[in-house]
């Protein structure tokens, strides 16, 4: 009996040589009456219209083409089941042995900011997933292909043993169910967002494999990198690597942290990160000036770190960065001179990525047996309920330093204290179990630079001891959420030492 293949694709990459290979092997080609059929016929391939198989025309602007027993009976009939064969023969249904289908471009449609809700709905494929699932269910007899990357393997299997062919069909069927599940999850997520349902009764997220990593945080841990189907151009997932070795698990985490911090700034800025915490942040009139300040913030910790910048890297800045060992540099662009300088260092990774704030994403965190989901911490200085509870108000210079510290401290692991002047961080205390301990670390790191600096705290002071430590170090201004039952202690201490203190009403815990 002549084998038959039903072909209907939106992605025509590699299609013609693949279908020619099937046809040369004696496979009869069926297709719907759209672009796929035209492309095949223009390539000289004989094609049978699906309407001739079903005896029914395409209707409803093409919404119904293949939803017919002559198609699904041919896909689902088990070749080893005599009753199945008898039934399809009595009904004049012929088996279909290959299904080559990929789906309407729903992801691409919703990624287009100009696409309407109606456009999205029209790009929900119905017939395609139905054929894929029928074929995948009956993979004992049917070869189903959803990915052009598998075309060569299918052609090669034509001369393989039955066992090898079955193994390939099983592999392809598993891919199909993953693919259709991801497709449906994406549609479900889009419609859920459209109706504003915040916590649906079930949550399905879908990502595509981007990279198998050498290992995870440590060499004994296996790891991989997956990309959201709706990732932003301003994301590590869409960063373009211009130079260097493959990114590691830790590189990706740290680069993501650096990118999210540098997005906080509209002026030229540079951020150095180690272990997902900033070790130095600088701003300036130029990106070179900003990098110099980020480096000077902590020249020891930046070694082997990740640096993110929000302006093009020029020759002068590249020369400065080339003077030390850095794992990753990411920026919106690199001048040709800068690339030539940095590419001389074989171990450095250069990433080109848009540095703009995009749409807010949900933050996911896995716990054993479950998943936590929350909104991004997107609130900035202007989003708070700003008030000054102390007798003295900040000077203009102090306001500049306080705002810089507030931008940075939300990205530091709690308990977090950040000391700044108006141009750079001078001390960072991260991840401490008590706030006064975090302040002590930041103050020690700052040394003499604590004199006249501003202090930012991610959460309120439970006692007045942190204010007292700040005063003794010469800090003149503080920004914190406020809200402690003992706020009066901190306010009294600040007034005692002439410190200007700002309450924002916004907490920035980070775990």
UniProtKB/Swiss-Prot annotation:
What's the source species' lineage? Bacteria, Bacillati, Bacillota, Bacilli, Bacillales
Cite the Gene3D superfamilies for this sequence.
3.40.140.20, Methylglyoxal synthase-like domain (3.40.50.1380)
The protein here is known as Bifunctional purine biosynthesis protein PurH
Cited SUPFAM superfamilies: Cytidine deaminase-like, Methylglyoxal synthase-like
- Highest taxon, organism lineage: Bacteria
GO BP field: 'de novo' IMP biosynthetic process
Q: What is known of its domains?
A: The IMP cyclohydrolase activity resides in the N-terminal region.
Q: Which HAMAP family match?
A: PurH
Under the heading Pfam families, the entry gives: AICARFT_IMPCHas, MGS
Gene Ontology CC entries for this record: cytosol
Task: Indicate the segments forming the MGS-like domain, all copies.
Answer: 1-146
Its UniProt pathway annotation is:
Purine metabolism; IMP biosynthesis via de novo pathway; 5-formamido-1-(5-phospho-D-ribosyl)imidazole-4-carboxamide from 5-amino-1-(5-phospho-D-ribosyl)imidazole-4-carboxamide (10-formyl THF route): step 1/1; Purine metabolism; IMP biosynthesis via de novo pathway; IMP from 5-formamido-1-(5-phospho-D-ribosyl)imidazole-4-carboxamide: step 1/1
Q: Is-annotated flag, keyword Transferase? A: yes
| Reactions the enzyme catalyzes | (6R)-10-formyltetrahydrofolate + 5-amino-1-(5-phospho-beta-D-ribosyl)imidazole-4-carboxamide = 5-formamido-1-(5-phospho-D-ribosyl)imidazole-4-carboxamide + (6S)-5,6,7,8-tetrahydrofolate; IMP + H2O = 5-formamido-1-(5-phospho-D-ribosyl)imidazole-4-carboxamide
Q: What Gene Ontology molecular function terms does this protein carry?
A: IMP cyclohydrolase activity; phosphoribosylaminoimidazolecarboxamide formyltransferase activity
């Amino acid at each position: 009996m002549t084998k038959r293949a039903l072909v209907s694709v939106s992605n025509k990459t590699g299609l013609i040589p693949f279908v020619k290979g099937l046809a040369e092997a004696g496979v009869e080609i069926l297709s719907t009456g759209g672009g796929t059929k035209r492309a095949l016929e223009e390539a000289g391939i004989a094609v049978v219209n699906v309407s001739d198989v079903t005896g029914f025309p395409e209707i409803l602007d093409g919404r119904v083409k293949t939803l017919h027993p002559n198609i699904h009976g041919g896909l689902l009939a088990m070749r080893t089941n005599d009753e199945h064969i008898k039934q399809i023969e009595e009904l004049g249904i012929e088996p279909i042995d290959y299904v080559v289908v990929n789906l309407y471009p729903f992801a691409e449609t919703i990624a287009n900011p100009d696409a309407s809700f109606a456009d999205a709905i029209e790009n929900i494929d119905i017939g395609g997933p139905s054929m894929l699932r029928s074929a995948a269910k009956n993979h004992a007899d049917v070869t189903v292909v959803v990915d052009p990357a598998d075309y060569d393997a299918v052609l090669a299997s034509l001369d393989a043993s039955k066992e090898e062919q079955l193994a390939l069909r099983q592999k392809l069927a598993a891919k199909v169910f993953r693919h259709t599940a991801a497709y449906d999850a994406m549609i479900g997520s889009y419609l859920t967002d459209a109706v504003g349902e915040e916590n649906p009764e079930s949550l399905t997220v879908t990502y595509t494999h981007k990279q198998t990593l050498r290992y995870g945080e440590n060499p004994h841990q296996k790891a991989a990198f997956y990309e959201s189907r709706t990732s932003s151009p301003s994301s590590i997932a869409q960063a373009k690597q211009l130079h260097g070795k493959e990114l590691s698990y830790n590189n990706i985490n740290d680069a993501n942290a650096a990118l999210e911090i540098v997005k906080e700034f509209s002026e030229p800025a540079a951020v150095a990160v180690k272990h997902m915490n900033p070790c130095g942040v600088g701003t300036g009139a130029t990106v070179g000036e900003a990098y110099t300040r980020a480096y000077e913030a902590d020249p020891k910790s930046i070694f082997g770190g990740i640096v993110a910048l929000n302006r093009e890297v020029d020759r002068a800045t590249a020369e400065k960065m080339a003077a030390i060992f850095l794992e990753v540099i990411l920026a919106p662009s690199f001048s040709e001179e800068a690339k030539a300088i940095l590419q001389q260092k074989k171990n450095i990774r250069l990433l080109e990525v848009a540095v703009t704030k995009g749409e807010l994403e949900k933050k996911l965190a896995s716990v054993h047996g479950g998943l936590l989901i929350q909104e991004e911490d997107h609130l900035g200085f202007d989003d708070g309920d700003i008030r000054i509870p102390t007798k003295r108000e900040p000077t203009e210079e102090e306001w500049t330093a306080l705002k810089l510290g507030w931008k940075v401290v939300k990205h530091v692991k709690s308990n977090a204290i950040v000391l700044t002047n108006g141009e750079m961080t001078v001390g960072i205390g991260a991840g401490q179990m008590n706030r006064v301990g975090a302040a002590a670390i930041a103050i020690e790191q700052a040394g003499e630079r604590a004199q006249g600096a501003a202090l930012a705290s991610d959460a309120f002071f439970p006692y007045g001891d942190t204010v007292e430590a700040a005063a003794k170090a010469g800090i003149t201004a503080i920004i914190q959420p406020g809200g402690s039952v003992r706020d009066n202690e901190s306010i009294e201490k600040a007034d005692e030492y002439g410190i200007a203190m700002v309450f924002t009403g916004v907490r920035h815990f980070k775990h």
